[in-house]
Amino acid sequence: MVYTTRQIGAKNTLDYKVFIEEDGKPVSPFHDIPLYADKEENIFNMVVEIPRWTNAKLEITKEETLNPIIQDTKKGKLRYVRNCFPHHGYIHNYGAFPQTWEDPNQTHPETKAVGDNDPVDVLEIGETIGYTGQVKQVKVLGIMALLDEGETDWKVIAIDINDPLAPKLNDIEDVEKYFPGLLRATNEWFRIYKIPDGKPENQFAFSGEAKNKKYALDIIKETNESWKQLIAGKSTDSKDIALENTKVTDSPYYSASAASAIPAAAPQADAPIDKSVDKWFFISGSA
């Protein structure tokens, strides 16, 4: 399946939206794109939200029909992640698995925290920088459990199946073998990245340990089951998530007409980013 993007507005503005298209028709990256690209081989579709080494906090929105990717805001202002020395922006291609949901109505028995109400986050560690709205096929290697302001926020570690090293990476121990230092740097980055904004250091479950592939696959399956309950209208509380979709025909939220209501593409040149986003922050105790 080949997916394309439909951009509306200029990057780095409040109007910026990226819809994902299949055969020229908008689909939901939350609900319509299949989780599995190849279920037998455990190959997954990942939606790239934030390319590596960029700062804009882009995410699949839960509030709008067909869930376009937009830039997050706080108090009406666009959000950017800070540069925490020695890192620049997001240190991996950052995105999400479609058809997953970290259920905020459920407490995970091992993390002792509820889900964060988002699709499962994916950190793609391959050599190629992705682009917003790209649908990558990835293999899962492991998972970390960030505890973000009291919520479970899973971070799946994966690699693009087309990466030159993908054939050599099959489980979490292979990451340390072929990418020495990457897991440590990932742990550090997630611990400290909110500190420049005045927030406390994040914590991890499992003392920051990255769990193996089997554990990750179990979590993905659990969150896929939670999404199935959500899209079927059987969740305890759907948290006002926009559930319109164009592919899940047995869902009460299926809509054959939702795509036609999406505006035509209207891309504009990127707006400038405030120079303050370039600043480096030095965090005591990091690295």
From Swiss-Prot:
<keyword id="KW-0378">Hydrolase</keyword>
<dbReference type="Pfam" id="PF00719">
    <property type="entry name" value="Pyrophosphatase"/>
</dbReference>
<dbReference type="GO" id="GO:0005829">
    <property type="term" value="C:cytosol"/>
</dbReference>
<feature type="binding site">
    <location>
        <position position="121"/>
    </location>
    <ligand>
        <name>Mg(2+) 2</name>
    </ligand>
</feature>
<dbReference type="InterPro" id="IPR036649">
    <property type="entry name" value="Pyrophosphatase_sf"/>
</dbReference>
<feature type="binding site">
    <location>
        <position position="79"/>
    </location>
    <ligand>
        <name>diphosphate</name>
    </ligand>
</feature>
<keyword id="KW-0479">Metal-binding</keyword>
<dbReference type="GO" id="GO:0009986">
    <property type="term" value="C:cell surface"/>
</dbReference>
<keyword id="KW-0460">Magnesium</keyword>
<dbReference type="GO" id="GO:0006796">
    <property type="term" value="P:phosphate-containing compound metabolic process"/>
</dbReference>
<protein>
    <recommendedName>
        <fullName>Inorganic pyrophosphatase</fullName>
        <ecNumber>3.6.1.1</ecNumber>
    </recommendedName>
</protein>
<dbReference type="InterPro" id="IPR008162">
    <property type="entry name" value="Pyrophosphatase"/>
</dbReference>
<comment type="similarity">
    <text>Belongs to the PPase family.</text>
</comment>
<dbReference type="GO" id="GO:0000287">
    <property type="term" value="F:magnesium ion binding"/>
</dbReference>
<feature type="binding site">
    <location>
        <position position="153"/>
    </location>
    <ligand>
        <name>Mg(2+) 1</name>
    </ligand>
</feature>
<keyword id="KW-0963">Cytoplasm</keyword>
<feature type="binding site">
    <location>
        <position position="121"/>
    </location>
    <ligand>
        <name>Mg(2+) 1</name>
    </ligand>
</feature>
<dbReference type="GO" id="GO:0004427">
    <property type="term" value="F:inorganic diphosphate phosphatase activity"/>
</dbReference>
<feature type="binding site">
    <location>
        <position position="116"/>
    </location>
    <ligand>
        <name>Mg(2+) 1</name>
    </ligand>
</feature>
